[in-house]
Every structure is written in C-alpha cells, then in structure tokens.
Amino acid sequence: MDAVIAPRHEDCRDAERRAEPLPANAPLSMPVQSLLQSPQAAAVRSPAAWRRALIMVATAVLSAAGIYEMYQVLQVGGITVLEGVVLVLFAALFAWVALSFVSALAGFTVLCCGWRDDVGIMPDGSMPAVSSKIAMLLPTYNEDAPVVFARLQATRQSVDETGRGAQFDWFVLSDSTDPSVWIDEERCYAELAATHDRLYYRHRPYNTARKSGNIADWVERFGGAYDFMVILDADSVMTGDVLVRIAAAMETNSDVGLIQTLPVVVQARTLFARVQQFAGSIYGPMIAAGTAWWHGSESNYWGHNAIIRVSAFAGSAGLPTLAGRKPFGGEILSHDFVEAALMRRGGWRIHLAPTLRGSYEECPPSLLDFAARDRRWCQGNLQHGKLLTARGLHWVSRLHFLTGIGAYLTAPMWLAFLVAGILISLQAQFVRPEYFPKDFSLFPIWPAQDPVRAAWVFAGTMGLLILPKLLALLLVLIRSQTRRRFGGGLRTFGGVLLETMISALTAPVMMVFQSTAVIEILLGRDAGWQVQHRGDGAIPLREVVRRYALPTALGATMAVGAWLVSWPLLLWMTPVIVGLLLAIPVALLTTRVSRSRPLLMTTPEQIDPPAILAQVHALADRLRPANQTTDPLSALCSDRRLRELHLAALAFHPPRRRGRIDPHLATARVLIDDAESYSEAAGWLGPREIRAVLGDRETLQRLLKLSGEHAQLAVGSEPSG
C-alpha cells in the first residue's frame, strides 16, 4: 500500500473539520498507589509454579557446583581475606550466569517442543475480530518529527489493511521542549490529519513525571473512552496483524492486564547497531521464550510495544513519588517494571508474547549512545531498591526488580573480581607470606591456588556464557525456513562468530561505563532527561578519545600490572585487557555506516524487508519539506494553516494558575513590548523565551502583530476546539 499524506496546499481548516486536535474528555480516575498497604485483589492462579521450581532448583544446583569448585581452587592453602572476597564475588556472579543459562535452556526446550501461548494467541491463525476501542499512544520528546509521524502512519496503514482500523484511535503525546521540534510536530500532524480522522495531537506545557506522567495525563483525561491502549516509543513500528491479535487476546482473557510483545531491532546502519540487531534477532526469541515460560502471568513490561487494559492500569498503576532526594528519591524513572508489578498486585495477569512477529524498534547507533541511555536505565533500576519491600507484590515481581538492579551491579562486581584477582597474584609474587601466624596454629598458612581446577572453572563459566548462543544458532540451523530467512546456515554461523567477537571486545568497555554509572548514582548524580540520539552514530574523534580515555587507561594499567606479576596472569586477563586497549579504534570502527547489504550478521528483516518499514522511509520523505525552516516563529508567520492549528491547539493547554509566574514568559512579554519590529523582537528572544511565547496565545499574538502583513490574521484566528 502506498504511503498517503495530505496534499501540502490543503488548508488546515479542512483538517480541523475532519479531526479535532483532541477528542472530548472522558476522565478516568488514576489514584496514586500506596507502597505501604496491599490492596484487596482476586488471586491469580498460574500454571508456572512447577516451572519456577524447576528453574530455581536447576539454578541452585548449578550455582552450588560452580561455587564449590571455586572454593576448591582457593582453599589449597587456606582462605585468605582477598580469596574470601574473590569467592563471595564469584558466588554472586556465577549464580547470575547460572540463572540466565537455565532460563535460556528452558527457552530452547520449549521452542523445540512447540511453544503454546498462555493467552491463546495464534500467530498464523485467521485474523480475529475485534470489538473493543483501542487507543494507540505515541509519547515523544524532542524527536525527529517527520520520522516519528511516519512510523505512526505506517503502523496505522497496516492496521487499516486488516479491516479492523475503525476500532483504533491514534494519539501523539508530545513532551517536546525544543520549540522547533514542537512546531514541526504540529506541521506533520496537520499533514496527516488532513486526510485521516481519529488522529490526535496533544502537547504538554510541563512534562511532569516524564513519560509515565505523559501516559497518566492521557489516562486521566481520555482513558474512560477506551478499553485498551497500546504504548509505542518514538522508534516503534508495529504491524496491524500483531496489534489485532494482541487486542483479540485481551478481549478473550478478561483477567489479563497487559501483553508485552518482543520488539525486534531493525534499520541498523552502523556496525554497533547491526551487532545488537543480529543478537536480538537470533538469540532474543529463545531467551524471551524461556522467561515467558517460567514467568507466566507474572511477566514484565518493557515500556513500549505492549497492549494494556486501561481500567486495570488506571486502577492499579498510579505511581507514587519516592521519598528522599534524587537520584534514589523523587519520580520513578524505570516506571514500566513498577507499573507491571502494581498491576499484578492488583490481581491482573501480565504476559509476554515471545513468538509474535511484527513488533519493531531501533537501536542506538553507537556504544556511547547506548551507554547514555543505559545511564538513565541504571538509575531507574537502582531506584527499584526502594520498592523491594512494597506490600503485596508477587515474589516474581520482586525478582524482576532484583534482576534489573543486578544487571548493573554485576558490572562493578566483575571489575572488583578482576582487581581482587590481580591483588592476589601481586600478594603471592611480592609480599613475603606469613607461614606461621602470631596466633597458635599447628599448620602453616600457604597462599596457594589450584591452577588446573581454576582453568576448569574458567572454561565452565565461559561455557555457560557461550552455550546459549550455540543453542539459538542450532534452533536456526535445524529449521529450513528460519535458516533461509537468516541467509543460510554458513552465513548465520559466521554471523554468530563475528557477533561474539565484537561483543567480547565491547563488553569490557561497557563494564567500565556501567561501573562508572553506578558510582555516579551512589554519589548522588542525577541522570536527567536527555534526548535519545537516533542518527547515524557519527562522533567526532576528539569526543571519542575523551569518552574512551578511562577504559583505555584502565586497560593499560591492568596490562602493566599483570605483566609485572607474571605472563600467565597477563594471558589470563587478555580478553578483558584487549577490549579496553582497543576501545578507541573499536569505537571508531563500530560507528561507521555501511550503505551496502552486509554479508554477515544479516537478519530476516534485511533479507526480506517488511513492507511497513519501506513505508516509513517513503512517508518520512514526504513529510519533510525541502525548504523547511528551523525557526519556529518564522514557520508560524509564513504558514497560515500551521499558525491557525497552533493557536487552536493552545486552547487545550491548561490555564496558568494565579500566582504562578513564568519568568521566561514575563521576559518575553517585556522584550516584545519594547521591540519596534517583528525581526527585532524575534532576535531578542532566546530558546526558552520562544518556547514560553509559543505556549501562550496572547503573547504569541502580540508578537505576530509586529510582523505586519500577518497582524490581522493572527489576531483574528480563533481556536476551533
């Protein structure tokens, strides 16, 4: 189906006749939930109890075996203090690896035996009927507007092709603070609304509570009119097939509050993004199937590409503000985990649908961009430590919090483990051992380890890390259709080797970045809310050197320290040291954009691109004018329909509260009143003043009056809502 947008010459009044900027209010109460009291909720019976017992027992047995072997390595001459530290760190890290391995093994098994969805979704069955009213919500914050709207429109066209489009309404919920982005969003909305009804746009003047507050604001204003809502990210694309199927599953299962799909990374252009794309495509389904199998009705929510029962969300997921100062207090950052836990506490089932195809997202183009996003997630996940003791949570929900915290604490733990290992070697090499301590002892203390057993422990640990990759590869190779979708068995095998090599090089650097993030958070540094970079990944050389100086210096220090101790220690630490020493060249290599189709690490979406992704590109090109101005005020002055739409949309902004003064708006009013011309006033206004002017109808009209030819039109424009 061709991408369709409004003709550029069509007046905005025609668009307003087809679709109001916002629908009529349908308020729905969303009370803040208490963490100190457990609500009364119906019990949820899950068939996953025996599955969880199996997973936990297998993890415990595997962990005990690994820890015992490590103890045997260290106890040859008695456990010293440093060896005790190493043993404790190893126990925690090995248990983490063991749980991941057992869960992946479960995923391999259930996919081999044939996955059966707990909510009855049939990926290849006939298209089900849907009678419920569904809202598609796209929260956005300072993103590239033409691309964001193109993704939404491509998703909409795919839904319309199923014949179920009448059940869906479409909302763009903007929290953008950049004036140019704000006006560009309105321009794109006007283009699409001219030919498509049930498309709505709302801009919040104050982005209270960030994304979670954006969704909560919509629920409280419009949620009463809808049965379900689908949350998208700015980089999300979903096919109509998957949307209709998860909506039908929600109708069939009245006690299900949320179904999370498995988003597949697409549109990767840099080598780093391609590694993430390939890894997610080949390993992701098996890992997700394993977690879905034993999480059951206590699965998790990842914040996007998921369908939610609006009444359940409103009644159970109102987020409280955490006591204390940032970064651990204040607004809950990683809200998705918490919302899922609260909904499950409220008696609603939370499910993951790992086998549905047609749910897509994109990946940061570079390791630095990935680390910047990871920094926010790290703070949000560590914040969950305050929620572990919340009353009434299911133990699996608490486990989600623990695993989220552990995902970041394991980085400094691995680093501490490496440092402790070096110190033990230094102690053995340079410190004269005290064979006979001051206290009475019948036997001397020999600082010694068992090198042969240590090698076996290392090999076993590496096996647990690598074997899931091989199992996922095996799943592809034994299925002829899947093998062809990845480009053939040989290319897939080569892709796994290349992905493993690049991941091994970047993992030590990510360990340093995550360790730094944890330390910063513990020192009280807040991550803020930065714009997600989704470009081509190009980073200036000076910035690369500056940002990767710490990992490189750490690698050099480790290399020198290990070399001074012994060659065997240096060889033992080579995988980590090489990754750190090559941090800068690997960073430059992995941010390069490849224009040609790659030979290795290809995914099904690259071999046979879905039509919906091609539509995104076509729509984005049509929504982006060739001579677009970046000045939002000039855009309003030169475009009558855009000006009318903006003034109409301001009618939906909440009125200013008496006694609350916006200093930027007050400054703008003084500057505008003092100016003798539009160009003079516009030149005096800074970005914050421009944003304040754009959000105040009266002040904006005073500025437009100065533009002469637009004066009467600007003043005479009335909101159509």
Curated annotation (Swiss-Prot):
CDD domains: Glucan_BSP_MdoH. Its EC number is 2.4.1.-. The chain crosses the membrane at residues 54-74, 85-105, 404-424, 458-478, 493-513, 548-568, 569-589. This is Glucans biosynthesis glucosyltransferase H. Pathway: Glycan metabolism; osmoregulated periplasmic glucan (OPG) biosynthesis. It comes from the Bacteria. Keywords: Cell inner membrane, Cell membrane, Glycosyltransferase, Membrane, Transferase, Transmembrane, Transmembrane helix. It is a multi-pass membrane protein. Pfam families: Glyco_trans_2_3.
